[in-house]
């Protein structure tokens, strides 16, 4: 047992920096940014400067770029020297299997897509989106300012959720099918503005109509990209809704 414990301690010592290095370097660039930002967040809560500095010194030994990113995120000056390891740090073979984003398969199956409608919304377009979302094995969820609304064909329908109680954080992608008069009203409603801005900040796909663009997206500086698509581009929206728009992230938040 003593020999086993000694061998185990040696293995732990030898891989103390090598394993974290291999893990970090195996990630995609966006995952590396998230790791660095998460460490910055956690260390920002540490009140003792020496502990923060010691942790950054450890990170510099794991990976110099990671350590410098965290130090910069904390505004740490001067940057501490890396820890001197007791054994040389190994550059182990990288493993893409450790990634989450990198190996994720685009899919809408089992997910939920919100469709924002209001009085006079286009009934035909609503049905097209419901059918496309269902065909992708996802669940369409009708959101409206009021539970009961009347579409442009005279049909009165019941929404699945009221806008104020159905924030976009609950959905994997969002669609907006509203007329100009309704868009003007919603442009003055904080919950509606947050509905779009949060979806954009959370890197979700957005399908927008002309009124949504004119009265909400443009005034709120919600920029277009590959996953913010015009309402008529149903097939494109479905494809983009299967994953997040990671290229958008540097434009909506400051990552380490």
Task: Please report, for each region that a protein language model flagged, where it lies by residue.
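Single conserved hydrophobic/aromatic residue that forms the stacking wall/gate
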Residues: 1-4, 8-12
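Single, functionally critical "micro-switch" positions that shape active/binding sites
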Residues: 4, 47, 209
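A generic "binding-loop/recognition-motif" signal
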Residues: 212
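Short acidic (Asp/Glu) and glycine-rich catalytic loops that position anionic groups and cofactors
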Residues: 14-19
């Amino acid at each position: 047992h003593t020999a086993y414990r000694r061998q185990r301690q040696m293995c732990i010592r030898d891989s103390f920096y090598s394993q974290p290095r291999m893990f970090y370097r195996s990630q995609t660039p966006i995952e590396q940014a998230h790791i660095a930002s998460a460490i910055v967040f956690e260390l920002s809560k540490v009140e003792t400067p020496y502990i923060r500095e010691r942790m950054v010194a450890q990170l510099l030994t794991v990976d110099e770029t990671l350590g410098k990113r965290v130090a910069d995120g904390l505004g740490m000056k001067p940057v501490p020297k890396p820890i001197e390891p007791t054994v040389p740090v190994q550059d182990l073979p990288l493993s893409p299997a450790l990634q989450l984003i990198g190996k994720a398969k685009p899919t809408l199956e089992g997910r939920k897509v919100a469709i924002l409608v209001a009085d006079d919304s286009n009934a035909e377009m609503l049905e097209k989106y419901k059918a496309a979302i269902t065909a992708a094995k996802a669940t369409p969820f009708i959101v409206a300012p009021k539970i009961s609304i009347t579409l442009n064909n005279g049909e009165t329908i019941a929404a699945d959720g009221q806008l104020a109680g159905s924030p976009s954080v609950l959905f994997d992608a969002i669609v907006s099918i509203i007329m100009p008069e309704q868009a003007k009203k919603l442009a003055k409603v904080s919950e509606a503005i947050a509905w779009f801005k949060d979806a954009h900040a959370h890197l979700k796909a957005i399908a927008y109509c002309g009124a949504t663009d004119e009265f909400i997206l443009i005034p709120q500086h919600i920029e277009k990209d590959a996953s913010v698509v015009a309402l008529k581009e149903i097939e494109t929206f479905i494809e983009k809704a299967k994953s997040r728009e990671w290229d958008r992230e540097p434009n909506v938040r400051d990552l380490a």
